[in-house]
Each structure stands twice: as C-alpha cells, then as structure tokens.
C-alpha cells in the first residue's frame, strides 16, 4: 500500500480551522454542487499520492491526522468551487492556473477569498491566455451558478468563515469556529446531528425544540439538511 502523504499536524492547534473527512466533504459538495463528486476526485484535486502521481493537484494538501485525510473549512470552500467549475466543463488545467494566479494575488486559499466572489473568474487570468478564453466562456455560468453558492458564504478578514448550505435565510451553518465546523443551528450552536437524532427517536419537532432551546423551524431545517447529507453520502 502506498504511503499516505499530507500535512502532518504535530503540535498544530486545530481550533477555528474546521475539519472534514474526505467523505464528509464529498457529501457536502454532492448535496450543494455536483452529485458526481467522488472521494477520489477530491483527493486528486487536493494533492498527489503515489498512485495518482500523474495528476498535479489544484489546491494544497489535506491534513493527515492519525492516518486519515482531513480538509479544513477553507479547503472545503475551495473544493466546492472546483467541483462547480468542473461540472460545467472547465478543464483542470485552466482551474489550476487560475488558482495559482489567485494565490499570487490573494495568498493561500484564493477560491475561498472574498475577492474571488466580487471579481469573478477573470481576476485570475491573463489576457489572451488559453485559460482566459476558456473561462470567459464560463462567465455566465459563474454569475448564475457560482455567485449563488458564494452568496451563502460569510467572510472575516476577506476569508470564508461561514457557509449556509441551505441558504442564508435558513438556520443551518457550517462555521469552523463552532464545533470544528460541523453543521449547527445558527442561533444556538446546537449540532444539527443532535436535533436530527432526537427527532428520529420519536420526539415531536416541538418537543425537540423545547428541549434544546431552538425554534421549531431550526429543528425542521436540521432534519432537512441531515437527511440530505445522508442521501448524498
């Protein structure tokens, strides 16, 4: 078996970065962006393993924790954008070059930067380049598909800090500063998995809401999202 490669943690503090397994990341992306996204594809976009050596990664490598690959929240946001672009036929080569130019302009995780949302695809390209021509053809797609996704992302210091997978008007959020980025109720921080489990035990939505101090709407949003994640898994 090939040796796993990634960024080993050592004494690195994980507070506030969010942590998602490859399968969890794929489920989030399949639910919101591209149903065909696979675990292997995410790893291919993130880094090159021995058996995938012919593929040059797009984003930085995942963390390696006790033999398991974990993506940070910023990486999850980047992977979501990559998946959306690939779903519309933008080549990996064009996305990779756009990411490289974005990193030069914005620093690490350019696809998770607020500038990407405001400036669009063109900010990462050089006039006349191969990828500029290709990505310009996708500008309408960017406005119709990518913008709605990024509109549900909140930023702190220009970096993605919170994502509302059901939309900003709904109560479910992914926030790396809360519960390591697991989906939670926006107002209380109660994990959606907890609300879902209690509902599945036979309790009414009203009883669950009263027990955890959340609204009935929050309980129903949690059930909807957790059900969707399980279908996407």
Predicted stretch roles:
Residues 68-99:
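A short, Lys/Arg-enriched interface patch at domain edges and termini
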Residues 188-233:
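Long, charge-rich, low-complexity alpha-helical segments
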Residues 51-53, 142-180:
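Basic, low-complexity segments
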Residues 90-153:
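Charged mid-protein connector segments
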Residues 11-42:
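Polyanion-binding surface elements
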Residues 1-12, 169-190:
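Short, Lys/Arg-enriched anionic-surface-contact patches
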Residues 14-15, 85, 197-198:
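Short alpha-helical segment immediately N-terminal to, or the first helix within
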Residues 35-63:
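Major-groove DNA-recognition helix of helix-turn-helix-type DNA-binding domains
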